[in-house]
Amino acid sequence: MARDKFERSKPHVNIGTIGHVDHGKTTLTAAISATLSQYTGKSKKFDEIDSAPEERARGITINTAHVEYETDKWYYAHVDCPGHADYVKNMITGAAQMDGAILVCSAANGPMPQTREHILLAKQVGVPYIVVFLNKADMVDDEELLELVQLEVQELLEKYDFPGSEIPFVAGSALLALEAVANNPTIKRGEDKWVDTIYQLMDKVDEYIPTPERETDKAFLMAVEDVFSITGRGTVATGRIERGKVKVGDTIEIVGLRETRNTTITGLEMFQKSLDEALAGDNVGILVRGIQKTDIERGMVLAAPGSITPHTKFEGEVYVLTKEEGGRHTPFFSGYRPQFYVRTTDVTGTIAQFTSDDGSTAEMVMPGDRIKMTAQLIHPIAIEKGMRFAIREGGRTVGAGVVSKIIE
């Protein structure tokens, strides 16, 4: 069974389908899975994807279906959410961080409200690359109409700062491709024009989405979860390394809650054993030089010097939980003071102002709303654009958000 090893050697890419309801996102997911199943020998059917199981991410229940498939180049983990609210929640909580997305737009209808909304969301939560699939092309006899829809989608993408003219477009029919594969499971490339459009789409995705940067290649960062002092050796901060790598002897910064300080790593421990280097994903204890136990606390981060700065004011995109999801039962107003749970700690902050997601001003925020808000924290903490946070009140999560802009 040498085959399993081969699968793991390909880079993993996280991808998802976005677009207006009923434009064929789930059908396309099923068509890709079926068409590429000759690589893996397994595919997921439409109804398996559509009746997605519930998952919990940051205290919010999300229905997401995970489908895996591979091309010659990459191994894909694909997320499809059946409900529109699930998309919003999935993208904001980062339950699945996407390296790229396939925007599905019906060639027969053109862009619709959720097409715009998903492009906007993709921009706000930092989906870096989009490839477009114009679905239901079998219903459009006129080439010019197809070109018109493509132009409309390009303009929409450019409006939200995606490079519309560079983004690859493929027109096809997910349904007809799916039917062709169902009727002839051994169908090869070149034997059916609709199945070929699925191959063309995946070629474009392979080419256009670059290999994701591995977490270990990024600047080192670890959120402090706990602090101990070891007699005769000094202070140890423990936590899980979020990204990057770190070695004994490296200089690092302690950021957040107080003045930023520099220190040197004098030891690394994992599972009671010492190690020379720790990588992203490791749960470690970091021994730091010249730092008292009282100088460092949960909620601070240890980071590569200059890689992250403390802030108190930021803008964020927030999904407010419904009562059924365990959120608030009543609306809140400007001046609301909840706790913001960032990485490992709660910091009190004020929600100064907010607008609803379409940019109109909102007087109050109802459970289930999606808003843009400005938050002012009482202590500076290490935050950066694209970072996830939860809003909590009395220990329960009332909202989930992503930082869209740092103000100060």
Swiss-Prot record:
Residues involved in Mg(2+) binding: T26
The family assignment reads: Belongs to the TRAFAC class translation factor GTPase superfamily. Classic translation factor GTPase family. EF-Tu/EF-1A subfamily.
Location in the cell reads: Plastid, Chloroplast
Region annotation (G2) ranges: 59-63
Identify the stretch(es) annotated as G5: 173-175
Q: Which UniProt keywords apply?
A: Chloroplast, Elongation factor, GTP-binding, Hydrolase, Magnesium, Metal-binding, Nucleotide-binding, Plastid, Protein biosynthesis
Q: What is its main location?
A: plastid
Q: What is the lineage of its organism?
A: Eukaryota, Cryptophyceae, Pyrenomonadales, Geminigeraceae, Guillardia
Q: Which residues bind GTP?
A: 19-26, 80-84, 135-138
Q: Where is this region: G4?
A: 135-138
Please give the name of this protein. Elongation factor Tu, chloroplastic
An MF annotation (GO) of this entry? translation elongation factor activity
Whether Protein biosynthesis counts among this entry's keywords is: yes
Concerning Pfam families, the annotation shows: GTP_EFTU (PF00009), GTP_EFTU_D2 (PF03144), GTP_EFTU_D3 (PF03143)
What EC number(s) does its UniProt record assign? 3.6.5.3
Reported function: GTP hydrolase that promotes the GTP-dependent binding of aminoacyl-tRNA to the A-site of ribosomes during protein biosynthesis.
Give the region (G3) as residue ranges. Answer: 80-83
Give the residue ranges for region: G1. Answer: 19-26
| Occurrences of domain tr-type G (ranges) | 10-213
Q: Is GTP-binding set as a keyword in this record? A: yes
Gene expressing this chain: tufA
Kindly state which reaction or reactions the protein catalyses. Answer: GTP + H2O = GDP + phosphate + H(+)
Q: A cellular component term (GO) from this record?
A: chloroplast
Q: Which domain of life is it from?
A: Eukaryota
